UniProtKB/Swiss-Prot annotation:
PROSITE patterns linked to this entry: ACONITASE_1, ACONITASE_2
Top-level taxon of origin: Bacteria
Pfam families: Aconitase
Protein name in the entry: 3-isopropylmalate dehydratase large subunit
The encoding gene: leuC
InterPro entries associated with the record: 3-IsopropMal_deHydase_lsu (IPR004430), Acnase/IPM_dHydase_lsu_aba_1/3 (IPR015931), Acoase/IPM_deHydtase_lsu_aba (IPR001030), Aconitase_4Fe-4S_BS (IPR018136), Aconitase_4Fe-4S_dom (IPR036008), IPM_dehydratase_rel_enz (IPR050067), IPMI_cat (IPR033941)
Length: 472
């Protein structure tokens, strides 16, 4: 009998019952909530007269709609100018109080982007099933978790039953061996993967990321990669547990202590695919060949190394891709064969659940130190992923590096990743962004998004256009 993959092990450990149609009822260990996908779920509980099944499994924080300017933030919820955004944040606050759910509120130092806060607090632990009403919940798979996003009706179901009906995915292994070169980051790795397999390449699969590159990668780097599994078409992305995982979790607020810690570690050390496990699909990349990446179009798969030019229609593989590229040229205001360095940038955004952790901010600061934002850049902003990340960065003096260079140093939140708060692009503006999505209008109506790493974004802010960070 063949061995099990990590995904198989996590799935089997959480099956409550198998249904006649082949789907399974899974037990959910951790449920993270935010203000956008939870209001109707809480209303459903109220109308049915139900209470959350296991209060301690649920933790909430507002992130999508919160303002990141200090002036607005100091006013708390009342400082949110947009009525809909303010109502959503207030409703989360009210619901958490009504149901006695722990919430890291808008002015709590622990508040932040839910996918930064969960691991930071030790709410995310190896071996857990983790769900949240947000597609980038795959982030938590970096800890050897089975983590994925859910819809609002499923949020209600988890609140009420602590279980969820799911159909099992197939197994895919993405193996990246070799050693990353100078200036090549986890963000470049995942963009290169998406560039290779496309945004539908992982559809129907749970992706395990393996190989030397991921073994060498930090936990925060693994979070960046797993975060974008959804952009590769998969709901689930994960990395096996190792000593780095255990060391990261140790001592965090919600991590087990004493004898419970020892028992947990013994289990966590089993969370890897068996040597004889069989995957349904295997994708391989040579990490040594990966360069810093820049997305040029309106899909994460429209990505190229910084050394390349915008592709021409002759390079498209079929008519569908030719049509997609033609529309992307028009929307992005680019020409086939245009050099990336010729794209005039308007704004730079360093933040989001993909790249707003302390390592990301350090990487950007290393590039920025002693330099100035180019006069042609209208706005360059750093948005830490949580209050604690912001606090740590300020302790290290990183905020001063950015402020002296001409960056804005913001309060934590989702910010310019998506057009649901005050941080938006104007029509026609090009933005070097460390976020995860670049479809039409993602950062604001008519806004043009280019996905890059924090180091590449920082270099672009200084140069005023894309430049190979390896030359800095």
């Amino acid at each position: 009998m063949a061995g099990k993959t990590l995904y198989d092990k996590l799935w089997d450990d959480h099956v409550v019952t198998q249904r006649d149609d082949g789907s399974c009822l899974l037990y959910i260990d951790r449920h993270l909530l935010h203000e956008v996908t939870s209001p109707q779920a809480f209303e459903g509980l109220q109308l049915a007269g139900r209470q959350p099944w296991r209060l301690s499994a649920n933790v909430a924080t507002p992130d999508h709609n919160v303002p990141t300017s200090k002036k607005e933030r100091d006013q708390g919820i009342a400082g949110i100018e947009d009525d809909t955004s303010r109502i959503q944040v207030q409703t989360l606050d009210d619901n958490c109080k009504a149901f006695n759910i722990v919430e890291f509120g808008i002015n709590d130092i622990r508040q932040g982007i839910v996918h930064v806060v969960g691991p930071e607090q030790g709410l995310t632990l190896p071996g857990m099933t983790v769900v949240c009403g947000d597609s980038h919940t795959a982030t938590h798979g970096a800890f050897g978790c089975l983590a994925h996003g859910i819809g609002t009706s499923e949020v209600e179901h988890v609140l009420a039953t602590q279980c969820l009906v799911q159909k099992k995915s197939k197994n895919m292994l993405v193996r990246v061996d070799g050693v990353l070169g100078k200036g090549v980051t986890p963000k470049d790795v995942v963009l290169a993967i998406i560039g290779k397999i496309g945004t539908a390449g992982g559809t129907g699969y749970a992706i395990e990321f393996g190989g030397q590159v991921f073994r060498d990668m930090s936990i925060e780097g693994r979070m960046t990669v797993c975060n974008m599994a959804i952009e590769a078409g998969a709901r689930v992305g994960m990395v096996a547990v190792d000593e780095k995982t255990i060391e990261y979790v140790k001592g965090r607020s919600y991590a087990p202590k004493g004898e419970q810690w020892d028992q947990a570690v013994a289990y966590w050390n089993t969370l890897h695919s068996d040597d004889d496990a069989v995957f349904d699909a295997v994708v391989e990349l040579n990490g040594t060949e990966i360069e810093p990446q820049v997305s040029w179009g309106t899909s994460p798969e429209m990505v190229i190394p910084v050394s390349k030019a915008v592709p021409t229609l002759e390079q498209a593989k079929d008519d569908v891709q030719r049509n997609d590229w033609t529309r992307a040229y028009q929307y992005m205001g680019l020409n086939a064969g245009q050099a990336l360095a010729d794209i005039q940038l308007d704004r730079v955004f360093i933040g989001s659940c993909t790249n707003s952790r302390i390592e990301d901010i350090r990487a950007a600061a290393e590039v920025v130190k002693g330099r100035k934002v180019a006069p042609s850049i209208k706005q360059a902003m750093i948005v830490p992923g949580s209050g604690l990340v912001k606090q740590q960065a300020e302790k290290e003096g990183l905020d001063k590096i950015f402020l002296e260079a001409g960056f804005e140093w913001r309060e934590p939140g989702c910010s310019m990743c998506l057009a649901m708060n005050a941080d938006k692009l104007q029509p026609g503006e090009h933005c070097a962004s460390t976020s995860n999505r670049n479809f039409e209008g993602r950062q604001g109506n008519g806004g043009r998004t280019h996905l890059v790493s924090p180091a590449m974004a920082a270099a672009a802010a200084i140069a005023g256009h894309f430049v190979d960070v390896r030359s800095f």
